[in-house]
Amino acid sequence: MQYFKNIVFLLVLFNSFQAFSESIYNITPIEVSKNVYVFFGDVNNLNNVNGGAISNTGFIIGKKSILVIDAGPSYLYASRVIEIIKSYSSLPIKHLIVTHHHPDHSFGISKFIEIGANVIMSQAEINMYFKYGNRLLRQVKKSIGDNWFIKTKIVKFGNNEEFPLNLDLGGRKVSIELYSQGHSEGDLVIEDLLSKIIFVGDLVFTERAPTIPHANITNWNKYISDIKNRKWDYIIPGHGELIKIQEQLLLTKYWINYIDKTAKQAVLNGTSPAEIFNEGIPASLRKYKLAKETWIRDLPLLINKYESE
């Protein structure tokens, strides 16, 4: 009997340790320019290994303060990011810029509020965060496990900022612009003027297929063209690797235009998503990571959207 008790104890201990270890974010920032760093997210879907850390988080160190771009998927993630930033600089984290409300970018907000950071987010996306945040939090907990979301909560905060907005971190100026009704209802784009690095959030994806749950494809397409024509050395997308050349922006453009055209044609012809899926994923889209999952999930959303217009 004691043997079985010991076995049960060891199993419980192992499972507890496993749950704890799975909740540690093994992340390391990459310095993409002097005092500009990026935690590049996993390019897979959120799962119980990556803990939802699938988007890119950045931070910029000035002479007086630090600015962080995107809070990440959870309180634990944000805590780890802050811990790492403090190992690079003792300066205060004064600003958190949240590019939009999607969980992988915003669910770490409460931790930054705890340390006194000023949260900057478009009003349209604050509204979405408040409206859908708790529902989305329940969904991601169910999807990958509660252990990743310890202390994660949707918190109230105000926003009195108007865009474009200019911030001075001390010898380092940052501009923030609002791109309304693009990938989301209010995407923020952040440029570090010293390094000519632009953080564009989910207006641009590399390596993987772009997602379109709240997108206005027409505007989004225009915004990518606008970003492409700006003067920059590097672009940090919301997902995927560093962008060094303009051609990398075309991957997002091609996908969103293709899925948009397919959805509109389906509505015009009365074609159902199932009929399109029976033909398989188009060959030109197969090079995108997560292409099949994204195509199957997002095409019906667009078709339903255009049918209701």
Protein language model regions, located:
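Divalent metal-coordination and catalytic microenvironments
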Residues: N35, I60, D70, I85, ...
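Conserved beta-strand hairpin/beta-sheet module of binuclear metal-dependent hydrolase folds
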Residues: S33-I84, L188-V200
